[in-house]
């Protein structure tokens, strides 16, 4: 049996095959196709239209982006620090799929990308030359430049990823809902998420995600183009950039159709080590003492100035162009990427508590990101301020993609290091496109199993769509067009994120009601109940039954008990289903499920699962050389109850079912009478 809740309703025999979500797919594809073709065919018109819409969005919603980003952060930290932080992303009996070290390594990889190579030099130098307020080319401008860079890549953005990852993991692994954004809205809209509301939400997620990925790929293409120019004297133009996009699309198609994606994952892991090596190279071959002092100062400045930066709208200074190019762009970019990275974070975090998840997401990748930005950013600033290389800063202002390579040119073995940086950037670029195609395919598929991936042809389509959109943006106005489009396209999903917060909080409140109902004593049982005497109890504790005895217990005790309860409820006009599903690991055994339907409220599900464990050496079964034994464990909707029915009588099994049912009814009652609450619950068979 798997470590997570083994439910009959999850068995593939009871479900249809995965299928395309036609509405989300066709609407998203049509919007992207129209946008891309219009941009490619009518360059000037598209550029003017983007600028006009951007002016409207920035003048109308700049305050909103700042406030929204801060509220996302406050919500995530509040949930993690509250009592809800103990709730697991999955049933309460679930265990993490990955060890702490492996999980940390995967979180670490989430913090690395080609955009870090681009902005680690370009942003600090841009702010140093032209800060949003105050005089440029001063020590204060240098400090501001690093603080703004850390702020744009800091806690606020990672909280957006954590919010979506937390919601996806909670609703998918605890409530068995699809691994899509609409699932988080079930507590608000109920089954309406299967209609236009859900389609709109998922479409907004797809549109935002593909623009976020296209922006990253576009930035990567421009930077790689310059890297190839440095190494092989290739020209910097749209033709070379188009060829790079085509190469990425082809590699992605090969990856998703031939199974070499495992090889790409290995390469991306190697890439992490190479990236760390590149960072250490700059640290130890540069002015190490200065860089370490600057790192400590940067962290201190970031922490001390963070409260004022979080809501800094420059209401009086009004550097509109600066806001559009930096803070608004970054917040929209984080919003656009949040479904993509959130899905990745959710998938690797099943079985962890919300507090563990948020802590890991906010600390591990953030530490690396801040260290990378500080080392490269301060190296560039040191080269400009103390070595007098003002040309580096001027180059960044005119061609930001040149900054990273021009900084590397100041160090020994430049051709070799530039080659390593180019290969690293290319792999980051390809893996972003590859992962993006997979995630977009998942968002446009209706799965019968949340662990499935989208069909290959769908991932191929999205790989081509990412390439087409990236090319369209580069043809319009390069990186500026990508930034402008991200600010615009990230806006709709930013509203969805507030609905995600509301749905998640509403569902977490139900955990309080469930806990309260579980703590209440069931009604006293009247009559002569055969309570296990101490000798029977001792025999039961020491017993480790095999397949034969477990099957006998199921057939002679558990099955009659379950059917007795079902028949009595059916006499009272209650809809009840009983299922017997063979185990995959031992077809002689089966698990028993009884589902009591409660109309619009959450159904009561009680399951009896034979769970196989390794027989302990001290047991009689272990001494006889038998490898396994079984426990008859009970599962409710929220997961394992931790008990074992082996040795129970029929009446005791019936009493256990009724105790759990009564507590469930108490839970529904508490939820029903709570102020302002509507009892909308996920349908486990949906």
From Swiss-Prot:
Q: Which residues lie on this side of the membrane: Cytoplasmic?
A: 1-22, 82-100, 172-203, 259-265, 347-356, 434-459, 506-686
Quote a single Gene Ontology cellular component term.
plasma membrane
Instruction: Explain what the UniProt record notes about the effect of disrupting the gene for this protein.
Output: Mutant is impaired in osmo-dependent choline uptake activity. The betT1/betT2 double mutant is completely impaired in choline transport.
Please verify whether the record's keywords include Ion transport: no
Q: Where in the cell is it found?
A: Cell inner membrane
* PROSITE patterns assigned to the protein according to its UniProt record, in alphabetical order: BCCT
Q: Which InterPro entries match?
A: BCCT_CS, BCCT_transptr
| Record's keyword annotation contains Transmembrane helix | yes
Q: Which GO terms describe its molecular function?
A: transmembrane transporter activity
**Database matches in Pfam families:** BCCT
Going by the UniProt record, its keywords in alphabetical order are: Cell inner membrane, Cell membrane, Membrane, Stress response, Transmembrane, Transmembrane helix, Transport
Disulfides per UniProt:
none
Q: Where are the transmembrane segments?
A: 23-43, 61-81, 101-121, 151-171, 204-224, 238-258, 266-286, 326-346, 357-377, 413-433, 460-480, 485-505
Topology check: give the Periplasmic ranges: 44-60, 122-150, 225-237, 287-325, 378-412, 481-484
- PANTHER family, per this entry? HIGH-AFFINITY CHOLINE TRANSPORT PROTEIN, HIGH-AFFINITY CHOLINE TRANSPORT PROTEIN-RELATED
This molecule's function is given as: Uptake of choline in the presence of high salinity. May primarily serve for osmoprotection.
- Which family, according to the similarity comment? Belongs to the BCCT transporter (TC 2.A.15) family.
NCBIfam families in alphabetical order: bcct, PRK09928.1
Q: What is this protein called?
A: Osmo-dependent choline transporter BetT2
| Gene it is expressed from | betT2
């Amino acid at each position: 049996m798997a470590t997570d809740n083994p439910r009959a309703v999850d068995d593939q025999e009871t479900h249809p095959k995965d299928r395309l979500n036609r509405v989300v797919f066709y609407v998203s594809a049509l919007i992207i196709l129209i946008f891309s073709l219009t941009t490619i065919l009518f360059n000037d018109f598209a550029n003017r239209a983007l600028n006009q819409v951007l002016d409207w969005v920035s003048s109308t919603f700049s305050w909103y982006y700042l406030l929204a980003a801060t509220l996302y952060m406050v919500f995530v930290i509040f949930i993690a620090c509250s009592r809800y932080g103990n709730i697991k992303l999955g049933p309460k009996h679930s265990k993490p799929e990955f060890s702490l070290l492996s999980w940390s390594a995967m979180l670490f990889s989430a913090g690395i990308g080609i955009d870090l190579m681009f902005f680690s030099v370009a942003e600090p130098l841009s702010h140093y030359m032209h800060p949003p307020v105050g005089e440029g080319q001063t020590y204060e401008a240098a400090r501001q430049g690093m603080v703004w860079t850390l702020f744009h890549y800091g806690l606020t953005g990672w909280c957006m990823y954590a919010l979506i990852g937390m919601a996806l993991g909670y609703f998918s692994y605890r409530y068995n809902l699809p691994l899509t954004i609409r699932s988080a809205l079930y507590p608000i809209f109920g089954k309406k998420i299967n209609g236009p509301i859900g389609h709109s939400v998922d479409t907004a997620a797809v549109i935002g995600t593909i623009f976020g990925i296209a922006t990253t790929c576009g930035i990567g293409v421009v930077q790689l183009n310059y890297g190839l120019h440095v190494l092989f004297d290739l020209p910097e133009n749209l033709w070379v950039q188009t060829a790079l996009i085509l190469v990425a699309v082809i590699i992605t198609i090969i990856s998703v159709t031939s199974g070499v994606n495992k090889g790409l994952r290995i390469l991306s892991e190697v890439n992490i080590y190479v990236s760390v090596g590149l960072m250490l190279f700059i640290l130890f071959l540069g002015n190490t003492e200065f860089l370490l002092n600057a790192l400590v100062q940067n962290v201190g400045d970031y922490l001390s100035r963070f409260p004022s930066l979080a809501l800094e709208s420059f209401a009086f200074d009004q550097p509109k162009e600066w806001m559009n190019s930096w803070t608004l762009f970054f917040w929209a970019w984080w919003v656009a990427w949040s479904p993509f990275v959130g899905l990745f974070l959710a998938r690797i975090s099943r079985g962890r508590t919300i507090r563990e998840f948020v802590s890991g997401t906010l600390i591990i990748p953030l530490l690396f990101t801040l260290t990378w930005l500080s080392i490269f950013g301060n190296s560039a600033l040191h080269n400009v301020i103390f070595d007098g290389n003002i040309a580096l800063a001027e180059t960044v202002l005119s061609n930001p993609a040149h900054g990273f390579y021009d900084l590397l040119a100041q160090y020994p073995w430049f051709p070799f290091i530039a080659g390593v940086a180019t290969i690293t950037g290319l792999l980051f670029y390809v893996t972003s496109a590859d992962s993006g195609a997979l995630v977009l395919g998942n968002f446009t598929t209706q799965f019968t199993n949340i662990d499935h991936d989208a069909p290959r042809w769908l991932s191929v389509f999205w790989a081509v769509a990412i390439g087409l959109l990236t090319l369209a943006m580069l043809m319009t106005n390069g990186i500026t067009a990508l930034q402008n489009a991200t600010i615009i396209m990230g806006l709709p999903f930013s509203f969805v994120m507030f609905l995600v917060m509301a749905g998640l909080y509403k569902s977490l409140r139900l955990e309080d009601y469930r806990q309260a109902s579980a703590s209440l004593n069931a009604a006293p049982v009247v009559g002569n109940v055969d309570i296990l005497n101490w000798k029977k109890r001792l025999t039961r504790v020491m017993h480790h039954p095999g397949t034969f005895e477990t099957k006998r217990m199921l057939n002679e005790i558990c099955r009659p008990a379950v059917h007795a309860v079902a028949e009595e409820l059916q006499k009272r006009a209650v809809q009840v289903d009983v299922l017997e599903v063979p185990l995959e690991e031992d077809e002689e055994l089966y698990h028993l499920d009884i589902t009591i339907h409660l109309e619009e409220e959450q159904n009561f599900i009680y399951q009896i699962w034979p769970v196989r464990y390794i027989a302990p050496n001290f047991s009689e079964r272990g001494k006889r050389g038998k490898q396994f034994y079984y426990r008859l464990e009970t599962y409710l909707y929220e997961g394992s109850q931790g008990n074992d029915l082996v040795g129970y009588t029929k009446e005791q099994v019936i009493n256990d079912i009724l105790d759990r049912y009564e507590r469930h009814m108490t839970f529904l009652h508490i939820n029903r009478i709570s102020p302002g609450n509507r009892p909308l619950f996920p349908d486990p068979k949906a």
